[in-house]
Each structure stands twice: as structure tokens, then as C-alpha cells.
């Protein structure tokens, strides 16, 4: 019988000092991806990947934790400064930006890149609670 060896990949430190932090904040979750300037992902985290379930994923605290986790992982690759691209209407937008700054990343620019339709698809019906 052939014996399986441990084939877990080791992370290679990349030494990238500037990058882009993409914050996708929806009504249900917040996803933070940190890339280099070409768009290649270095680190990511989301509220759901950190163990938040259900309506707790959409809280600003969950977004803060996701941003901290992504920032720590990217700083292992030597990341120091980031531009921030924020997309979506969710509750965790500002909390995620503050968490990136508190984690030790220097923020050079903040852009809102939320896609706005020029009267495209019909929106979902209004909620009646």
C-alpha cells in the first residue's frame, strides 16, 4: 500500500509593500480581500469564514474582525500601505476601514466603487416587516 505524504503547501513570503484592499459589504456578509497592485490576491477573510453565522455576519463587529484577519495575513507578506476600494451598501463599510488602519496598515486612498445601474435590472421587491 502506498503511503500518503503530507502535501500541505507552505506559504511563501512575497515582500509586497503596497496593495489594494477590496471591501465587499453586502446586507448579509462582509468580505475583505487584499491584493497586490495587479489584482493578485494575497489574503482574504470574511465574516462567515471567521465563524459568524446568520444575522451576526452582517454586523460591523464581524466586518472589523474580518478586516483585522486579512490585514494580519497580508502584513506577513510585507504589506505596509493599501488603497481601499469599498463596494456595496452593508453595515460593515466604515468598521472594516477603521480596522485596517488599527491593524497597522497605512491607508493612502479610499474609493467607493459600488456599481450603480443606469436603469438596468429590476430591483427586488420591498420588504414588508
From Swiss-Prot:
Keywords: Ribonucleoprotein, Ribosomal protein, RNA-binding, rRNA-binding
GO biological process: translation
Pfam families with a match to the protein in the record: Ribosomal_S11 (PF00411)
Keyword ATP-binding found: no
Domain of life: Bacteria
InterPro entries named among the record's database cross-references: Ribosomal_uS11, Ribosomal_uS11_bac-type, Ribosomal_uS11_CS, Ribosomal_uS11_sf
UniProt-listed PANTHER family: 40S RIBOSOMAL PROTEIN S14/30S RIBOSOMAL PROTEIN S11
Subunit structure: Part of the 30S ribosomal subunit. Interacts with proteins S7 and S18. Binds to IF-3.
GO cellular component, one term: ribonucleoprotein complex
Signal peptide segment: none
Name of the protein: Small ribosomal subunit protein uS11
NCBIfam families linked to this entry: PRK05309.1, uS11_bact
Function: Located on the platform of the 30S subunit, it bridges several disparate RNA helices of the 16S rRNA. Forms part of the Shine-Dalgarno cleft in the 70S ribosome.
Annotated GO MF terms: rRNA binding; structural constituent of ribosome
Entry similarity comment: Belongs to the universal ribosomal protein uS11 family.
Amino acid at each position: 500500500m502506498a503511503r500518503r505524504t503530507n502535501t500541505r503547501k507552505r506559504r511563501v513570503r512575497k515582500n509586497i509593500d503596497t496593495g489594494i484592499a477590496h471591501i465587499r459589504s453586502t446586507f448579509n456578509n462582509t468580505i475583505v480581500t487584499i491584493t497586490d497592485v495587479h489584482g493578485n490576491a494575497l489574503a482574504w477573510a470574511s465574516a462567515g469564514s471567521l465563524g459568524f453565522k446568520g444575522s451576526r455576519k452582517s454586523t460591523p463587529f464581524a466586518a472589523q474582525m474580518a478586516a483585522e484577519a486579512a490585514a494580519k495575513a497580508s502584513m506577513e507578506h510585507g504589506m505596509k500601505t493599501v488603497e481601499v476600494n469599498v463596494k456595496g451598501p452593508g453595515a460593515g463599510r466604515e468598521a472594516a476601514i477603521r480596522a485596517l488602519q488599527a491593524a497597522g496598515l497605512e491607508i493612502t486612498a479610499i474609493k467607493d466603487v459600488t456599481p450603480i445601474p443606469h436603469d438596468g435590472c429590476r430591483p427586488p421587491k420591498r420588504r414588508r416587516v
